C-alpha cells in the first residue's frame, strides 16, 4: 500500500485521528516559552538528564545551594491595615494592577511549592522564606531545621518599609544572613513536578544556568500593554548597555532563577544610584528595575558566570479555559510514566478547590 493510500485509508476508518495528526503536524502544539513542540519535550528532558549524569560522575555532590522564596498572606489583618494605609495614595502613580488586592491573595501555594523542593531537590542546603512579619500556618509541621523565615526588616532598609513592591524586595535578596553564594529564587506559585539535580541550576565549576525565552520584549511593547515587568526589564537593559555590547530582546522563562550573591553585590556597586532611585516605590511602577528575574541573570551571563540551558516548563493561567486541558494532559503523562516537565507555574486567582487539585497532580 502506497503512502497516499495509507493516508486515505486512515481518513476513511479514523477521520478524527487523521485530522488530529494532520493538524498537529501542520500546527505543532507548544506548551512552553521555548521553540520546541510538545513532541520534542520528552527527548529534550532525557538529553539534559543524561548530560547531567555524565557531569555528576566527574564531580562531587554540591551542598552549597540555597533556595529563596518571597511570600505574602494578603488575608493577614496586620498586613491589610498597612495595605489600606498606603494603597489609596499610590494607586494613581503605580503601574497597571500594582495595587490590585488580588496580587497579594494566598491560596496556600507556598505549602506545595516548599514541599516540592523538599521532595524533589533534597540536595538544597537551606530554604529561606522572605515575609512581612508573617508565618505560614503549616510551618511548625514542616522540617524547620531546613527552613528560615526572613522578615523584610532583616534585609531592607527601614526607610523603604513597608513595601508592597516585589521589585524592591528582590533587590535585597543578597542581604539574607548566611545565604550561600549560589541560590535559586522561587516565587510561591512555582511547583517542581519531578526530581531535579543540582546541575540543572549550577555546574560544579560554579557556572549557573540562564533559562532564556523565545519571546520578544519588542513584540510585547508593540502590543500596547506596558506592564511593570516589561518596563523594569527595559530599564535593566539600558543599564547593562553601559558596560556590555548587548542586543537583548529576550525575557527569561517564567521559572525559578539561579542567582549569585556576588553578582548582586556587583550590580549594587555599579548601579547604586539607579537602584536607590526606585526603592521608595511602595507598589510596582514603570520606573522599577527587574532585579532577580532579569538584571542579575543577564549580568551573570555577560560576566561569564552563566550559560543558557533548556528548562521545559508549563505556564498556567487557570482563569483560562485551556487550564483544565493542560492539567489533564500532565496527569495522563504521569499515569503512563512519561517524563514530566521540570515544573509548572500557575496564576492562582480562582476557586481554591481547583487550585488544590491541580497542584496535587504535580507533586504527589
Curated annotation (Swiss-Prot):
Regions annotated as coiled coil: none
GO MF assignments: transferase activity, transferring phosphorus-containing groups
Record's miscellaneous remark: Stealth proteins are part of a protein family that is conserved from bacteria to higher eukaryotes. Family members were first identified in microbes as proteins that help pathogens to elude the host innate immune system. Microbial stealth proteins are involved in the biosynthesis of exopolysaccharides. Stealth proteins are predicted to function as hexose-1-phosphoryltransferases.
Keyword Nucleotide-binding tagged: no
Alphabetic keyword roster: Exopolysaccharide synthesis, Transferase
Encoding gene, per UniProt annotation: cps1A
Pfam families reported for this sequence: Stealth_CR1, Stealth_CR2
Protein name as it appears in the record: Capsular polysaccharide phosphotransferase cps1A
Record flagged with keyword Zinc-finger: no
Superkingdom as given in the UniProt entry: Bacteria
Biological process annotations from GO: polysaccharide biosynthetic process
Origin species: Actinobacillus pleuropneumoniae
Function statement: Part of a capsular polysaccharide synthesis locus.
Amino acid at each position: 500500500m502506497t503512502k497516499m493510500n495509507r493516508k486515505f485509508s486512515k481518513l476513511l476508518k479514523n477521520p478524527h485521528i487523521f485530522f488530529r495528526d494532520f493538524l498537529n503536524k501542520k500546527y505543532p502544539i507548544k506548551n512552553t516559552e521555548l521553540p520546541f513542540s510538545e513532541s520534542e519535550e520528552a527527548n529534550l528532558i532525557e538529553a539534559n538528564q543524561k548530560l547531567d549524569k555524565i557531569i555528576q560522575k566527574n564531580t562531587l555532590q554540591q551542598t552549597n545551594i540555597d533556595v529563596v522564596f518571597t511570600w505574602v498572606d494578603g488575608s493577614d489583618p496586620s498586613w491589610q491595615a498597612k495595605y489600606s494605609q498606603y494603597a489609596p495614595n499610590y494607586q494613581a502613580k503605580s503601574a497597571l494592577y500594582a495595587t490590585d488586592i488580588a496580587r497579594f491573595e494566598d491560596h496556600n501555594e507556598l505549602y506545595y511549592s516548599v514541599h516540592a523542593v523538599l521532595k524533589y531537590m533534597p540536595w538544597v542546603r537551606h530554604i529561606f522564606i522572605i515575609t512581612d512579619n508573617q508565618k505560614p500556618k503549616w510551618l511548625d509541621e514542616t522540617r524547620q531545621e531546613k527552613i528560615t523565615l526572613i522578615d523584610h526588616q532583616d534585609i531592607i532598609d527601614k526607610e523603604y518599609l513597608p513595601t508592597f513592591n516585589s521589585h524592591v524586595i528582590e533587590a535585597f535578596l543578597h542581604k539574607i544572613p548566611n545565604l550561600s553564594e549560589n541560590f535559586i529564587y522561587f516565587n510561591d506559585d512555582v511547583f517542581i513536578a519531578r526530581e531535579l539535580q543540582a546541575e540543572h541550576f549550577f555546574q560544579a565549576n560554579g557556572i549557573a544556568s540562564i533559562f532564556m525565552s523565545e519571546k520578544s520584549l519588542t513584540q510585547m511593547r508593540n502590543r500596547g500593554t506596558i506592564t511593570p515587568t516589561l518596563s523594569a526589564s527595559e530599564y535593566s537593559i539600558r543599564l547593562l548597555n553601559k558596560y556590555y555590547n548587548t542586543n537583548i530582546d529576550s525575557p527569561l522563562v517564567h521559572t525559578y532563577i539561579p542567582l549569585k550573591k556576588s553578582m548582586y553585590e556587583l550590580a549594587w556597586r555599579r548601579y547604586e544610584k539607579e537602584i536607590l532611585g526606585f526603592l521608595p516605590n511602595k507598589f510596582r511602577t514603570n520606573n522599577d528595575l527587574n532585579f532577580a528575574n532579569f538584571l542579575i541573570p543577564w549580568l551573570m551571563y555577560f560576566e561569564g558566570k552563566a550559560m543558557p540551558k533548556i528548562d521545559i516548563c508549563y505556564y498556567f493561567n487557570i482563569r483560562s479555559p485551556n487550564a483544565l486541558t493542560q492539567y489533564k494532559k500532565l496527569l495522563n503523562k504521569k499515569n503512563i510514566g512519561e517524563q514530566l516537565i521540570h515544573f509548572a507555574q500557575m496564576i492562582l486567582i480562582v476557586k481554591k478547590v481547583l487550585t488544590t487539585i491541580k497542584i496535587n497532580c504535580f507533586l504527589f
